[in-house]
Amino acid sequence: LKKMALTFFFVPFFLVGCSSANEQTIRIYNESEVGGVRADVEGVIAETDEVYNGIAVFVEDELLVSLQVKPWLAFKKQKIEERVQKQFDEQYPDLNVLVSTDFKLYWESEKLLEEKDQQKVVDEVQKLKELAKEET
């Protein structure tokens, strides 16, 4: 009787834990006139199964992509980052692209989504790119 009660108690927890495993959030800040870029960027991020959240900030000729990798794949962050960077470099050779899995860059990119002043966004993207280069 105890085994059956424990089984009925724990089964819902396992089902709830598995139900939201495939959700992925992708947000994009796009102030350019290029309309197809948004769909392409969303597509590349969505195709990356290891990523559960992504933010892309596209201003002028700059593209900053911040990704959050699923926790159990944290040891593969660098490889995932390099693979996605290569995809964007091939797809957009005329853009300055930076892909990062660093949480601080993700957090700062998230703040940029709310920013209304485009010049401030451009300046912040430059600062974030410099910060990312310093960390490597």
Where do the language-model regions lie?
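C-terminal low-complexity, charged extensions that often adopt amphipathic alpha-helices
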Residues: 85, 89-136
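Post-signal peptide N-terminal segment of mature Sec-exported envelope proteins
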Residues: 27-48, 52
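A short interface-forming secondary-structure element
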Residues: 64-78
